[in-house]
């Protein structure tokens, strides 16, 4: 059974190389992600071709539930062309063997476009899909948002700077914080993390929402170097205003976390976005992912902000694909 032996350095290196070189690679499928989610149990499986080369892989994390069965989740996985459903079935079969009856479901949510045809094909292959059928519950009906604002930089082959991507009206918005004296620096040190965490917790308190502990982000720093993870910090006259965390992996840079201070931020979040996009341009990265939105509506503040930078329509993903392993527990725990 092709289950990755995490105690075999050569096997781990080969697996990681495949994950990082694959056009389907996702940072949440990297082995480092299990170090971030250190209260979950990692299980990693793969398929090889006749020459012994890895052709598909899935990194699962197993979490506890109120029952005696685990929840198995491959975030944004697997790493393969998921539209090849026969190959997907083979990989899922290996995953099910590796889970050995311990999980009630294997869930994965690849960044593949939704279509009625693909949705039906998955269901015909025995999978339960959660997408438009749960959309009325909003963006948090699924673990990952299904509607994402993604800037496709391959459409701008001659662009050298962020401003090259936009018409004059948008250029003016992006320039405004810099005209007002906002400056942005980036790195992956404890100093930048402390600055991020201050803005992150301030924003959470302002909106009355929970937030992750600093140890979570420290584990993220330990798992990913500055070529993969960068913290962007916007200041004006030495005063902290806004921050963001972005991760570069595979074909994209993903704007993952953000924070801002109370009061006048002089449009510093625009400056942070500008510099993150510049990082993508400087590294010839295909996509810049601003993450999820509630809806394509001016009533959604997330959409309004992200639409400044992404003029295309949101990408609608296929959503969650469940391989149900214990129907009774699944019916108890999964509510549509």
UniProtKB/Swiss-Prot annotation:
Recorded consequence of changing residue 39 to L: No effect on activity
Effect of residue 196 to Y: Slightly reduces activity
Name of this chain's protein: UDP-N-acetylmuramoylpentapeptide-lysine N(6)-alanyltransferase
Recorded consequence of changing residue 306 to M: Reduces activity 200-fold
Highest rank taxon of the organism: Bacteria
Impact after mutating residue 257 to F: Reduces activity 2-fold
Site feature (Important for catalytic activity) residues: 109, 320
Consequence of changing residue 320 to Q: Reduces activity 25-fold
